[in-house]
């Protein structure tokens, strides 16, 4: 990624002078320059960077040779951290390909310890990078993927914040109605819940407003011209049925099989979001970007306790569609 774009992203994060920022790098040694560019950009904003590496070699050497749990003394170094920035060149949390299977539980416990500590910080920001690995994960050619990500990142962040707030302010009342297809209507109760603007200090690329609806009070149907489920498949002309906050069925048998395999509370409607990024076009099956496409909305199932809901669940799936949100 170009250094000037890194500086633009960090400026949009609105870091405070004197705060401590942990740069959590998920990538390889060949991509390490990106980390160094973030170090410089954070320092230029008056904040102080710390770094934590998660290259395949680092993770393998650490976990293969660990004896016992992560010491609390080691975890204490993160007590001073105000903001965590994940620099994601590869999917965060996946074990190294050559890690011994018997070490998987150790790796999982290590990550759980880190995520538990980081989730309590003032800000957690995830930057999806234009890497070959990320392109492969979404089934796109590297150059096309890089162009799409870079364009999505290179926006006017001040205008994005203004546009997102204007969208939030346009809603009145505590019930949102979503109209899709010819006659599909979904109602969601948002009483007591607050809209959140994702405009530069959450996930990057950004560009959405979202809310956690009351879990038991979503009812109706949603039509998807294309329903993309990460690591499961892409389905066409699908209508899903939601009753009392649960996505209970669909018109596609493969998707129904996916629903049956979800963990407890995995079918709970967890989020309503609206895409706001003018530089992202076309729903291509990449959930990181698809949910930001201007003119789309998305519903999610699974976890929402981290953004105003009460559903605790190990999964979170976003499903993007076109329609009218009132």
Go through the PLM ranges and name each one.
Residues 176-179, 238, 248-250, 321-326:
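Short polybasic amphipathic segments
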Residues 1-10, 25, 37-47, 226, ...:
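Long alpha-helical, hydrophobic tracts
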Residues 97-98, 136-140, 199-201, 233-236, ...:
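A short secondary-structure junction signal
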Residues 217-219, 249-310:
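Dual-mode signal for accessory low-complexity, basic/Gly-rich regions
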Residues 28, 90-92, 131, 193, ...:
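Short, glycine-/Ser/Thr-/acidic-enriched flexible segments
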Residues 308-326:
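Compact functional segments
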Residues 205-251:
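Oxyanion-binding "anion nests"
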Residues 1-219, 229:
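Active-site bordering "gate/hinge" segments
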């Amino acid at each position: 990624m170009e250094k000037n774009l890194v500086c633009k992203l960090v400026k949009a994060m609105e870091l405070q002078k004197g705060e401590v920022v942990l740069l959590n790098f998920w990538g390889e040694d060949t991509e390490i320059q990106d980390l160094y560019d973030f170090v410089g950009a954070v320092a230029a904003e008056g904040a102080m960077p710390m770094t934590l590496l998660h290259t395949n070699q680092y993770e393998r050497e650490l976990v293969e040779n660990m004896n016992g749990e992560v010491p609390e003394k080691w975890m204490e170094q993160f007590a001073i951290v105000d903001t965590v920035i994940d620099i994601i060149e590869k999917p965060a949390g996946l074990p190294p390909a050559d890690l011994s299977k018997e070490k998987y539980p150790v790796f999982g416990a290590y990550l759980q310890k880190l995520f538990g500590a980081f989730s309590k910080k003032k800000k957690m920001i995830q930057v999806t990078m234009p890497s070959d690995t990320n392109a492969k994960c979404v089934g796109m050619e590297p150059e096309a993927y890089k162009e799409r990500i870079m364009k999505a990142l290179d926006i006017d962040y001040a205008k994005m914040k203004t546009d997102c707030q204007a969208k939030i302010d346009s809603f009145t009342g505590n019930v949102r109605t979503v109209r899709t297809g010819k006659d599909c209507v979904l109602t969601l109760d948002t009483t007591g819940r607050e809209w959140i603007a994702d405009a530069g200090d959450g996930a990057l690329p950004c560009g959405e407003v979202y809310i956690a609806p009351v879990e038991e009070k979503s009812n109706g149907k949603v039509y998807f011209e294309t329903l993309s489920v990460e690591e499961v498949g892409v389905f066409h002309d699908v209508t899903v049925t939601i009753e009392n906050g649960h996505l209970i069925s669909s018109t596609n048998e493969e998707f129904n099989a996916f629903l049956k395999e979800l963990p407890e509370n995995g079918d709970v409607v967890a989020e309503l979001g609206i895409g706001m990024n003018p530089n992202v076009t076309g729903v291509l099956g990449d959930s990181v970007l698809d949910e930001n496409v201007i003119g789309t909305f998305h519903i999610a199932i699974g976890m929402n306790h981290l953004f105003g809901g009460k559903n605790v669940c190990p999964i979170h799936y976003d499903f993007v569609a076109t329609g009218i949100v009132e």
